[in-house]
Structures are given as structure tokens and as C-alpha cells.
């Protein structure tokens, strides 16, 4: 089985090395195509305004000056002689929960794999940003191999990917695996305005304390309770529940 690895933290990210160790417990045919530099928060973006520069790091490791989406496209359509059987994107430094998935380059790597017709899983590791920036990968390294093997054999409809988040706890403190829905988070987002050396303003987006809906059954609730969250996500963003309501309003508004 051929496995393609990508991420959004870049080719030198520790989480990518962790993911490669995980993948090698499943198959010996593992390829890495990852961004040359950090592409966090770029979501499912393509590079269209400049060329894609590819650097071969080793026989099966490639760095691309592009986004995670670019990486999966290049791997599937250029680098590999045949499509992989599985795309793993991660392991991201920090969880990708709730509204995170709309911004996440990690999830986007799995989205693009799904668009290419490949079984795809996004993998992220929660951690507390305030505690010295240290990330413990033990949970992912311990539990991901068996979990991925199981998820590989689950029949999924076309256009569905899986978003896996590991809790921030000791590996032996994990309270199981939960299939979850996407929760709702507020990011406490603010704009930090500063002045450069020439007196011109510039800005940073600053994330504050997160808060949200921690209802049972959601990804954020599961991770908070030290459970591994597995959320199936659909590429089809249509809200079927309001189609008829809108159609009725249009009929009544136009007299149709």
C-alpha cells in the first residue's frame, strides 16, 4: 500500500517526522511531499500567481514551495508514478477542531486527497499553547497506527474525509475513541496594530482565549475529555435542510 504524507507546518516540522514513523508501521511504501515553509492557516488555497518550485530532499522526500493543496496535486499528478492508496496530512501542531477546519491547511491536504479520489485522513495533536510551547507526540505515536488501520477499512462515500484529533494527555490516559460532529468555537480574534521604523502602521491577527459550545458528541468536547476525536467531513457544503424553504420563498416572491 502506498501512503502519501503532507502537512501545513512544513517539511522540517516535527509532526511530519512523527507521522512518517506512524505510516511506516503500516506500509514501507511511504512518500512525503510537504511545503518548503510553514503554510499554516492557508486552508484549501492554490498557488496560481507564481511557479511551484520542487526540491527533492531524498529518494521519497520532496519539498514544494507551495501550499498543502499544491503538494497533494503535485504528488498525485507529477511525482508519483501512480496515485497513493492513502493520504495522511499532519501531524499538526495543535488541534483542528470545530471552525478550525475552515482555516486549516492540514485539513486541506486531506480535502485535496479526497478530491483526487484518494482515502484521506487529517491528523492533529492538541496541546496547551501557554505551557512553554512543548508538544507531546506520545498519544499520536501510540494510538494512531491501530486507529488508521481501522479507519482505512471503513467504507466511506465519495467526497468524505476523516478529521482525527488527539487529546493533550498522557498516552495511557486516553479515554477511548469517539466519532464526533464538528463543534463551534469562538477564537477571541483581535487585531494588533503596530508602527514600523518609518512610522507606517502594520497589523497582526491575534488569537485570544478560545471559547465555544462544548456539547457532548462534538469534537471539542471529546478532546477536552481526553478522547480521540474522529469526525467525518463532507466536501459537499450544500445545506439541504433549507433548499425547499428558499425555493418556496422564491416561488412566493415571484408568483410562480
From Swiss-Prot:
Keywords: Cytoplasm, Hydrolase, Metal-binding, Nucleotide-binding
UniProt family annotation: Belongs to the SurE nucleotidase family.
Requisite cofactors: a divalent metal cation
Cleaved signal peptide residues: none
Lineage: Bacteria, Pseudomonadati, Pseudomonadota, Alphaproteobacteria, Hyphomicrobiales
Domain of life: Bacteria
Primary residence: cytoplasm
Pfam families named in the record: SurE
A cellular-component GO term for this protein: cytoplasm
Keyword hit for Metal-binding: yes
Source organism per UniProt: Sinorhizobium fredii (strain NBRC 101917 / NGR234)
Molecular function GO labels: 3'-nucleotidase activity; 5'-nucleotidase activity; exopolyphosphatase activity; metal ion binding; nucleotide binding
Binding site residues for a divalent metal cation: 8-9, 40, 92
Assigned EC number: 3.1.3.5
Name under which the protein is recorded: 5'-nucleotidase SurE
InterPro entries: SurE, SurE-like_Pase/nucleotidase, SurE-like_sf
Cofactor note: Binds 1 divalent metal cation per subunit.
Localization in the cell: Cytoplasm
Function, as annotated: Nucleotidase that shows phosphatase activity on nucleoside 5'-monophosphates.
Chemical reaction(s) catalysed: a ribonucleoside 5'-phosphate + H2O = a ribonucleoside + phosphate
